[in-house]
């Protein structure tokens, strides 16, 4: 892609909807606006501004209504955060559609629209590519909601086109949740009627009819300050964690011959440097998770009980060295079962992500096979491959140095 094409794709403004009262956060919001709710002693909006900056977007327009001076006094012109922040203050009773319409003169031709209470480490480059390739008026980000984390409000076609948007979340067979992070063409804002209306309820159904709204799906759980029920998970997510995922066979232990498996504990044999690598990670405060395909379970070569005993041997030998891994995730399915967990699918990574409130975009995946790397990339991890030139210990030393 040449520089002109890159420039044409670049989005230069983020718009944050931040005008609501935040009723579900009372009594905090009796005196403070929701975006300033402290998560680990940092106002939530700081995390959003930092993320926007990581997308190389440096112009931020914040749409305010409730206690606007609290936010303007705190953020100022944005220079402290390395961005340029401007504001549009509309009447308190304005809904999101009217709030966007009120700010029309300040909105760029194309912009990133965010909710002030949601955070997700999205793949922004994919979102942007989808927006351009689909020629959509709006490209929203949708959480897949495989785990029924909340009620879905979308129905999607296979190509990502939004077939139904249900603000009330009442219809059957919905799949996916709109979490914001929408790339928007300004023409959509111009089409908002001159009345006090909700942006999504008013505009999305019209775009659905025209086939002009698409979704980029993320499997990564999103985090929120929308209600107190979500706060604890959000606080856990934003705690600093250093994380490494390790493949098993061929990465930390000797790989069996093709189509063969480690079928007994005595067949599990550590690769040179693997235990030392795990000790080095633990010494430097990393969480360590094993991610392994074990189709031998489906094929009858070993039972789950035997697999457990193999992993127990691994645990015991690590404990003798004064360390251990934090958890093991395995896929017991055969290659043709169509599961989401078997690598190169990233299901085990997202299972770990949800269980431990991890940020996969800040995590590493080390494997010895292209399927490992593909799974890690689908999960948004930083990937490293063990090969003849790079042992697991070499790679771990590099990661430890990078994360100091």
Give the ranges of each region predicted by the language model.
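Asp-based, Mg2+/Mn2+-dependent phosphohydrolase catalytic module
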Residues: 305, 309-326, 334-365, 369-404
């Amino acid at each position: 892609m040449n520089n002109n094409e890159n420039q044409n794709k670049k989005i230069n403004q983020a718009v944050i909807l931040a005008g609501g009262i935040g009723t579900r956060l009372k009594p905090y919001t009796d005196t403070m606006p929701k975006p300033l709710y402290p998560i680990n002693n940092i106002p939530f909006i700081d995390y959003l501004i930092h993320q926007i900056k990581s997308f190389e977007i440096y112009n931020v327009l914040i749409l305010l209504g409730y206690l606007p001076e609290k936010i303007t006094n705190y953020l100022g012109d944005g220079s402290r955060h390395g961005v340029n922040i401007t504001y549009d203050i509309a009447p308190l009773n304005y809904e999101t559609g009217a709030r966007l319409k009120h700010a029309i003169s300040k909105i760029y031709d194309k912009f990133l629209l965010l909710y002030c209470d949601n955070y997700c480490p999205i793949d922004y480059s994919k979102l942007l590519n989808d927006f351009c390739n689909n020629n959509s008026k709006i490209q929203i980000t949708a959480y897949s909601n495989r785990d029924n984390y909340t009620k879905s409000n979308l129905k999607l076609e296979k190509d990502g086109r939004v077939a139904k948007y249900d603000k009330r979340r009442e219809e059957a067979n919905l799949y996916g949740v709109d979490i914001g992070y929408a790339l928007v063409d300004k023409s959509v804002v111009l089409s908002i009627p001159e009345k006090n209306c909700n942006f999504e309820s008013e505009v999305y159904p019209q775009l659905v009819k025209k086939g002009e709204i698409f979704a980029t799906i993320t499997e990564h759980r999103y985090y929120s300050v929308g209600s107190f029920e979500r706060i604890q998970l959000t606080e856990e997510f934003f705690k600093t964690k250093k994380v490494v995922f390790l493949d098993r066979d061929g990465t930390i232990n000797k790989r069996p011959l093709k189509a063969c498996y480690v079928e007994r504990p005595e067949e599990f044999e550590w690769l040179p440097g693997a235990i030392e690598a795990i000790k080095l990670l633990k010494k430097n405060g990393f969480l360590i998770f094993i991610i392994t395909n074990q189709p031998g379970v489906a094929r009858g070569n070993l039972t789950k009980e035997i697999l457990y005993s193999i992993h127990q041997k691994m645990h015991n030998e690590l404990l003798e060295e004064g360390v251990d891994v934090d958890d093991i995730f395995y896929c017991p399915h055969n290659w043709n079962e169509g599961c989401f967990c078997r690598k190169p699918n990233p299901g085990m990574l997202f299972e770990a992500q949800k269980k431990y409130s991890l940020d996969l975009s800040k995590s590493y995946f080390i494997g010895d096979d292209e399927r490992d790397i593909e799974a890690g990339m689908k999960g948004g991890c930083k990937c490293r491959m063990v090969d003849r030139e790079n042992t697991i210990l070499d790679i771990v030393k590099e990661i430890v140095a990078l994360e100091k």
